[in-house]
Amino acid sequence: MDITVREHDFKHGFIKSNSTFDGLNIDNSKNKKKIQKGFQILYVLLFCSVMCGLFYYVYENVWLQRDNEMNEILKNSEHLTIGFKVENAHDRILKTIKTHKLKNYIKESVNFLNSGLTKTNYLGSSNDNIELVDFQNIMFYGDAEVGDNQQPFTFILDTGSANLWVPSVKCTTAGCLTKHLYDSSKSRTYEKDGTKVEMNYVSGTVSGFFSKDLVTVGNLSLPYKFIEVIDTNGFEPTYTASTFDGILGLGWKDLSIGSVDPIVVELKNQNKIENALFTFYLPVHDKHTGFLTIGGIEERFYEGPLTYEKLNHDLYWQITLDAHVGNIMLEKANCIVDSGTSAITVPTDFLNKMLQNLDVIKVPFLPFYVTLCNNSKLPTFEFTSENGKYTLEPEYYLQHIEDVGPGLCMLNIIGLDFPVPTFILGDPFMRKYFTVFDYDNHSVGIALAKKNL
């Protein structure tokens, strides 16, 4: 009998009804169907077993290991330390590149670059723009609770604002439908205020009213004045598209609406912590997690000296540094250390001079530049003061975009102008350096972050 198995019998995964099994000497068609069905079931079971094994391997060796590492760090901390998740702008940028069919343009531009054409040969002009997307934004997500019944919320940890707000059960706008909502009627520690308020951000506006209740961060709780948000329409599409519920401001009191002390300062005022400071540690090997410590400094997060730079303004975490890139220099520039920025922003004129002869290509319609990851012409940033010197090598400001093209990287550097020449030292800087935000001494501490704990 012919039991030859032909490859095309399996082209759809399961055995075809008119396959070579018809060559078997089986008179009963029902028995033949049972055998075929048995093979199909066996195939499905085998496939499911392989997939379950793969899932278990990933869970055991990646996710579980990451959770265990984070829990070990939190357990051994001397001060209140909480883990947080990082949502980078990288995925949103790539989505936009694909949505607007820019992938081929970028590849073609890189071909121009490889052919020896100058950087001015790119597709798209310097004035092109895609609106309504804050590409420079990065979000640090941390968890906290509100009310004596500890209603859970996920917050953006934002050094560029100073109020805490949560969406209220009284919110009727569409953005609130998928969020955790604060219900004051379920908390015995709620105190009514009712003062109406509106919060303005770069991404939009939210409005609501002040309330007071117990706020818990980690194992610390305190009565705190915050905003119940009832209208998020002005904050769209950012709010609906993201996974956070509210914002926990870590800026200065002068930034706050209603002259509310930042929560870290209020923790010290109520003798919950010894020092009014917080720190950020972002592991280099894990782009999606970080650690916020409140009230003290965990020395195991950094190595070498911890250098402090005095603030030049009690509004943002803004210090004065001299900026050098090659022979380009800007003395006494404002430098804002910011947890809400995924890039290094530099004055436009400074950026244009820096990019000359670097073999980079502008991404059409977007404020970004692409280059080959092994581009040896890329420079090192140097920020200096009387107290210290802080460098940022290409490996820290390059973002690999292999899914656009092999060997391609994007520069996490954006041109941005302020009335006074200003640099924003965002995620690339904060991944290389452990940072301390010290309210008591009006300063920012900077030390080399440990690559491995």
Curated annotation (Swiss-Prot):
Active site: 158, 338
Ranges that cross the membrane: 38-58
EC number(s) given by UniProt: 3.4.23.39
Parts of the chain on the Lumenal side: 59-453
Reaction(s) catalysed by this chain's protein: Hydrolysis of the bonds linking certain hydrophobic residues in hemoglobin or globin. Also cleaves small molecules substrates such as Ala-Leu-Glu-Arg-Thr-Phe-|-Phe(NO2)-Ser-Phe-Pro-Thr
One function term, GO molecular function aspect: aspartic-type endopeptidase activity
Keywords assigned: Aspartyl protease, Disulfide bond, Hydrolase, Membrane, Protease, Signal-anchor, Transmembrane, Transmembrane helix, Vacuole, Zymogen
Peptidase A1 domain ranges (all copies): 140-447
Record entry for activity regulation: Inhibited by pepstatin A.
Homology family: Belongs to the peptidase A1 family.
Protein name per its UniProtKB record: Plasmepsin II
Gene (UniProt): PMII
